[in-house]
Amino acid sequence: MATNTSVYRLWQLISPNLPVGAYSYSQGLEQVIHTAKITDEAATMNWISGVLEHGLARTDIPVLLRVYYAARKGDDEGALWWSRQLLAMRETAELRLEDLSMGAALLRLLPELGVPVPASELPFAAAFAIGASAWNVDPTDACAGYAWSWSEQQVAAAIKLVPLGHTAGQRLLLALGERIEGAVTIASGLDDEELGMSLPGLAIASARHETQYTRLFRS
């Protein structure tokens, strides 16, 4: 049986077992559920798919692509420049902290797995791109995998918080999976000056979550 180790490395990067603490964050989802703006499966789908298509597709994923190609060329300065652009797109301290915390965790892990990393703090998408590039993961597959991993974490949070049953969670993942190719296509077609998107609802939810009295997820 022929094997493609780059596929397995992608599975490793998107695994819930990757020790970067992704399970600790809800990206504002906890707050909108707390205020009863999301109460069922349909509303959960509307929120997550909206952030995927209007947020990740125009921020994280296109930056991931640019850092991937910079890493392929050994262009640490280019990778760092795009990383800073992504951090500048974060609209709250909570979202920035999450990004840097997960990025730092992956940057600590990658050298233990034989992947050299630049001596800079990077957001998670950039660290992910460096790992994917080093392991020769197809760039389109890397983008789709990143989007899937993010979607899976959001659904896991919703299952706990709404709450939703696990069958509902699987229906959500099935539906979100059908949106990922479109999100990657959007991201792949953006010119540099087109990157970036403001999501006021997400920004407000994240800012309010920072001071929410009781919460399961980090801020």
Q: Can you say where each PLM-predicted feature lies in the sequence?
A:
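Metal- and O2-centered redox machinery and metal/ROS homeostasis
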Residues: 1-219
